[in-house]
C-alpha cells in the first residue's frame, strides 16, 4: 500500500505564522471536504535554515494522491507559501 504525505510549514513569509484557528479553518474547508480519512501530525521542521512548526497530512491509498496535491496547492495559495512537500512511501499496511 502507498502512503502519501503532504507536509506544510506554518511560517508565513513576512507575516507571522498560520495560527491554530487559521489551520483549523483550512482543515475544515479544504481537507474534510475532500478526504474521507487522513492522519494529521504536528511537528517541527527546517526550511531554508529556519525552524518552524509543520503539519503533515497523510493518506494510505493510491486514490487520494491527487487530492493531496489539490490541498497542497490550496495551502500554498491561501498562506503564501514558497513550497510544500509531498512524499510517498510504499508499505505493507493492514486494517483489522
Which residues does each PLM region occupy?
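Positively charged, small/polar-rich N-terminal and surface patches that mediate targeting and assembly
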Residues: 1-96
Amino acid at each position: 500500500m502507498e502512503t502519501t504525505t503532504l507536509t506544510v510549514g506554518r511560517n508565513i513569509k513576512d507575516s507571522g505564522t498560520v495560527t491554530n484557528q487559521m489551520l483549523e479553518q483550512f482543515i475544515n474547508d479544504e481537507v474534510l471536504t475532500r478526504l474521507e480519512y487522513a492522519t494529521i501530525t504536528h511537528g517541527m521542521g527546517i526550511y531554508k535554515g529556519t525552524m518552524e512548526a509543520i503539519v503533515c497530512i497523510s493518506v494510505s491509498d493510491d486514490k487520494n494522491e491527487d487530492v493531496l496535491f489539490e490541498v497542497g496547492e490550496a495551502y500554498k495559495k491561501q498562506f503564501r507559501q514558497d513550497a510544500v512537500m509531498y512524499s510517498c512511501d510504499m508499505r505493507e499496511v493492514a486494517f483489522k
